[in-house]
């Protein structure tokens, strides 16, 4: 029988009431903690984490991570968040906002005794993947002694693996896009019990870029929750706060009364740089600061790739990296890690690295392109001068951007000074870029995309007081990128649309074959807006317009006021009159003298009735005159348009990278400047004689070398033949037996004195195929003939000789 169940006895037995006492002690500590939080005075100033009512796991995690002193934003925001109030936190970059919301998240869930089966308790949204990873790493450090399960949900990872684990998470750090994907697709993931919602860089998340995504996420969340919003440039819009269902939020802005919105130890400067000189000045700056850590911000990923690839080919003498949103998540994380660990490096980046990321010891922040607003500028320069450290920032401004941008920065309390670039320090890389684009088509393609993306980024900006596209020198900017010409951009049309719309009918018909009149153009545009995306063949049939001779003839018959032009009436005749609708142009009687002839007036009228001629200017010197349908078809054939285009010019580059034409001819003045014609002739002849003599010496040396090689080959062949002949002579052959034996049956003295071969003779073997070919096609008899029996044996080796001697002696 099995032993009776009973209490454990022995050395390792626990006291019977140990678990009960431990549970009671934990409940007492929890009750004491809740009471301390309720008694917390919000007006009190806290200087260290030990002054706050924190749980033992949180306090131990902060101490292990060496967090002791509170910053201003942490001192004021944590106390309000511990009370369960909604908080809007605003502070300068690098002031410790991450801990200001992570500590309340851990404490509030701990006081509610949150467990794995309770579901998701806190959701932390971040605008970028890199910032989400950074928040998650800090959460792991300070929450190492808690029993909560935390997860990181960002794009670029396996969705299936995240779905399997998502239902067991208590705290999630995520980006909006991937979070919405899980809310829509993951069946076991539910947020009905959510307690806290945190938005880091809240103004960016609530911006238009994430508007639909964030609205959809909020629709899945319960309204009864605590919400924390933190950013260096906090939003106060009523619409944004209403979307989040905030309840009496506490606005905590510790630096609102400060004289500057940026860190005090940050030195900020700007440089007036024309657009075509930006890359030259950036290259000169990098070459002058090889022992520093620099971040360079550009407006688009295409620009980042082009500047990185071109500077990488030029080899400035410092490691280069690039970061943009089109890279895969593994590569982005690797670049962020490498840049954080580097001491001397340059990182070209878009605004994906402008918010929240903590890169240690960044010396310079360069903004090559003007930021879209003052808030973006503040976040960019916030990558340096963090945690009371020093830093420097430089902003590149085009002359057209200076006035508007300085006004916006002044409104945000950003102190900035103007500096000038020393001319002797500036280096031009225009020729090198042109040479690289000429040799590398991929780099040229990147340059074209970089140009287009920059122009588009300027075009879509809202603040037209800063961004004035028409004042930018785009052709010179394209040349500074190494491009042969400025790429064509579709959306840059200027005032051509308005001019075409207000032009008369005939002029509009000549300018474009697609736009026939003002009214028809307006009707066509309205139809395009109203028509559905899917159009049947019947829709196309009814919308088809006559684009042949009748349409052109009709446009000539119609005046601008909508009246018909009759042959015998003035321009004021009504188009609806039946008498003028059909009329005979001219009548000839039989035998009339004028039959078959035309007067000068008729010729003039026919010339006036002819279609107006269009002239198309192509790149060449000869314009294309379009006076018929056949000539108009030439525009569709590239091969036939070649004769109207000028001949191309080919450029060659010297060793220094300077471009030259393939054939460069001197003019008369340059020829005379070099001296007298006879002197130049004598000099030319002397140079040619010397060049011919040197070439002759080279030819003789080559011929001599060839003769020497030929002689060596011949001698080597002779040596091979001589060696083969010596091997054949070493074969041993004996004369036939003549019975010259002595009485004892041995060999004669002459045989004994015969010289032995100097070396073992070479045995030659024949291939099986050779033996088969040597045999005749008929079978030989197995019985040996008498002649073959009496023939002396063939001796080839020393063994054969010994066997022969044994036979003779025996």
From Swiss-Prot:
Question: Where is the protein localized?
Answer: Nucleus, Nucleolus
Q: What class of enzyme is it?
A: hydrolase
**EC number(s) on file:** 3.6.4.13
A GO BP term here is: rRNA processing
Ranges of compositional bias, category Basic residues: 9-25, 705-714
Reactions it catalyzes: ATP + H2O = ADP + phosphate + H(+)
The cross-references to InterPro entries, in alphabetical order and at most eight, read: DEAD/DEAH_box_helicase_dom, Helicase_ATP-bd, Helicase_C-like, P-loop_NTPase, RNA-helicase_DEAD-box_CS, RNA_helicase_DEAD_Q_motif, SPB4-like_CTE
Where do Basic and acidic residues bias regions lie? 522-542, 690-704, 764-786
Q: Where is this motif: DEAD box?
A: 200-203
Domain Helicase ATP-binding: start-end pairs = 78-252
One GO MF term attached to the UniProt entry: ATP binding
According to its UniProt record, what is one Pfam family this protein matches? Helicase_C
Amino acids binding ATP: 91-98
Highest taxon listed in the record's lineage: Eukaryota
Main subcellular location of this protein, as a coarse class? nucleus
Give the residue ranges of motif Q motif. 47-75
- Per UniProt, residues of the Helicase C-terminal domain are 278-437
Which GO cellular component does the record give, naming just one?
small-subunit processome
Q: Which UniProt keywords apply?
A: ATP-binding, Helicase, Hydrolase, Nucleotide-binding, Nucleus, Ribosome biogenesis, RNA-binding, rRNA processing
Annotated region (Disordered), positions in chain: 1-28, 494-542, 590-615, 690-810
SUPFAM superfamilies (alphabetical): P-loop containing nucleoside triphosphate hydrolases
Q: How does it assemble?
A: Interacts with the U3 and U14 snoRNAs. Associates with pre-ribosomal complexes.
Q: What is known of its domains?
A: The Q motif is unique to and characteristic of the DEAD box family of RNA helicases and controls ATP binding and hydrolysis.
According to its UniProt record, which protein family does this protein belong to? Belongs to the DEAD box helicase family. DDX10/DBP4 subfamily.
Protein's recorded name:
ATP-dependent RNA helicase dbp4
Tell me what organism the protein belongs to.
Neosartorya fischeri (strain ATCC 1020 / DSM 3700 / CBS 544.65 / FGSC A1164 / JCM 1740 / NRRL 181 / WB 181)
């Amino acid at each position: 029988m099995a032993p009776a169940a009973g209490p454990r006895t022995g050395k390792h037995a626990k006291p019977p009431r140990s678990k009960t006492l431990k549970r009671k002690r934990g409940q007492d500590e929890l009750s004491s903690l809740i009471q301390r939080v309720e008694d917390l005075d919000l007006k009190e100033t806290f200087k260290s984490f030990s002054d706050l009512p924190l749980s033992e796991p949180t306090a131990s995690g902060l101490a292990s991570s060496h967090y002791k002193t509170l910053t201003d934003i942490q001192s004021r925001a944590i106390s309000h968040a511990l009370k369960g109030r909604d908080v809007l936190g605003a502070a300068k970059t690098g002031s410790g906002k991450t801990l200001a919301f992570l500590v309340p998240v851990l404490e509030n869930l701990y006081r509610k005794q949150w467990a794995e089966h309770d579901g998701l308790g806190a959701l932390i949204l971040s605008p970028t993947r890199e910032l989400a990873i950074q928040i998650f790493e800090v959460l792991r450090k300070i929450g190492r002694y808690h029993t909560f399960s935390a997860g990181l949900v960002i794009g670029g990872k396996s969705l299936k693996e995240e779905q399997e684990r998502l239902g067991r998470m208590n705290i999630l750090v995520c980006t909006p896009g991937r979070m919405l994907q899980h809310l829509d697709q993951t069946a076991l993931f539910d947020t009905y019990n959510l307690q806290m919602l945190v938005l880091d860089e809240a103004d960016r998340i609530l911006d238009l870029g994430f508007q639909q995504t964030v609205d959809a996420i909020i629709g899945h969340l319960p309204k009864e929750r605590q919400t924390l919003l933190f950013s260096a440039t906090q939003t106060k819009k009523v619409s944004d706060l209403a979307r989040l269902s905030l309840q009496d939020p506490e606005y905590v802005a510790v630096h609102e009364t400060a004289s500057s919105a940026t860190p005090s130890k940050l030195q900020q400067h700007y440089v007036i740089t024309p657009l075509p000189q930006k890359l030259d000045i950036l290259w000169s700056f990098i070459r002058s600061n090889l022992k520093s850590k620099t971040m360079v911000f550009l407006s688009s990923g295409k620009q980042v790739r082009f500047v990185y690839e071109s500077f990488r080919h030029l080899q400035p003498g410092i490691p280069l990296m690039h970061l943009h949103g089109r890279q895969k998540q593994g590569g982005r994380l690797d670049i962020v890690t490498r840049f954080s660990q580097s001491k001397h490096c340059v990182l070209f980046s878009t605004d994906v690295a402008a918010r929240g990321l903590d890169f240690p010891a960044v010396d310079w922040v360069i903004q090559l392109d003007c930021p879209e607003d003052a808030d973006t500028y503040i976040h960019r320069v916030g990558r340096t001068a963090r945690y009371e450290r020093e830093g420097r920032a430089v902003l590149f401004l085009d002359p057209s951007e200076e006035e508007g941008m300085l006004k916006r920065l002044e409104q945000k309390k950003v102190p900035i000074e103007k500096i000038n670039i020393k001319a002797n320090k500036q280096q031009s890389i225009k020729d090198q870029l042109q040479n690289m684009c000429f040799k590398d088509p991929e780099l040229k393609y990147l340059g074209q995309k970089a140009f287009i993306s920059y122009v588009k980024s300027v075009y879509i900006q809202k603040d037209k007081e800063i961004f004035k596209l028409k004042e930018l020198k785009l052709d010179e900017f394209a040349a500074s990128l190494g491009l042969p010409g400025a790429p064509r951009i579709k959306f840059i049309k200027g005032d051509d649309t308005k001019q075409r719309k207000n032009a008369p009918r005939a002029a509009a018909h000549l300018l474009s074959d697609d736009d026939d009149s003002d009214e028809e153009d307006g009707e066509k545009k309205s139809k395009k807006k109203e028509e559905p995306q899917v159009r049947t063949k019947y829709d196309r049939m009814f919308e088809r317009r006559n684009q042949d001779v009748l349409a052109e003839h009709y446009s000539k018959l119609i005046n601008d006021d909508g009246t018909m032009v009759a042959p015998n009436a003035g321009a004021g005749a009504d188009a609806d009159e039946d008498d003028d609708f059909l009329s005979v142009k001219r009548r000839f009687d039989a035998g009339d003298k004028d039959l078959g002839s035309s007067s000068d007036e008729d010729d003039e009228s026919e010339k006036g009735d002819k279609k107006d001629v269009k002239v198309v200017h192509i790149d060449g010197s000869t314009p294309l005159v379009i006076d018929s349908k056949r000539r108009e078809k030439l525009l569709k054939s590239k091969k036939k348009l070649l004769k109207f285009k000028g001949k191309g010019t080919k450029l060659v580059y010297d060793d220094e990278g300077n471009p030259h034409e393939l054939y460069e001819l001197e003019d008369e003045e340059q020829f005379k400047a070099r001296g007298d014609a006879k002197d130049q002739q004598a000099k030319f002849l002397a140079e040619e004689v010397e060049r011919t003599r040197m070439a002759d010496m080279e030819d003789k040396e080559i011929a001599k070398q060839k003769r020497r090689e030929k002689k060596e080959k011949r001698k080597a062949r002779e040596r091979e033949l001589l060696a083969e002949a010596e091997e054949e002579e070493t074969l041993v052959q004996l004369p036939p037996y003549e019975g010259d034996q002595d009485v004892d049956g041995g060999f004669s003295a002459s045989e004994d004195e015969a010289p032995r071969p100097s070396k073992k003779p070479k045995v030659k073997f024949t291939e099986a195929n050779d033996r088969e070919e040597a045999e005749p096609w008929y079978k030989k008899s197995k019985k040996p003939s008498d002649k073959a029996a009496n023939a002396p044996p063939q001796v080839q080796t020393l063994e054969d000789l010994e066997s022969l001697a044994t036979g003779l002696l025996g």
